[in-house]
């Protein structure tokens, strides 16, 4: 019964619940068990809003139209583009995250445009600030 949620409360996700969701993502299968995908949990409101504005800019909509629908936490899945299976591996991680969230009564929605976000100068700076290698998308 998992479905995309497009309206969230301002209530933060308890750390214990968030950690369970993240753990499920880390146990996702990957091609050749290379485990190239990483998960960046953005819980800081200022950083979350920065990413929301960047995503809105890519959508070519006003920044007040939050592409993250007010979700208090944004989980970003990135994988090493040198791995030929990185898109599939990242997709499996996202599926595990979303199924775990549902099982813990936490709503989720797959939001696209991360690749485009992190190709911008602002996006590249964000990844660099978080010590994410350039080869990840």
For the regions a protein language model found, what residue spans apply to each?
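Acidic, surface-exposed loops and disordered segments
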Residues: 1-137
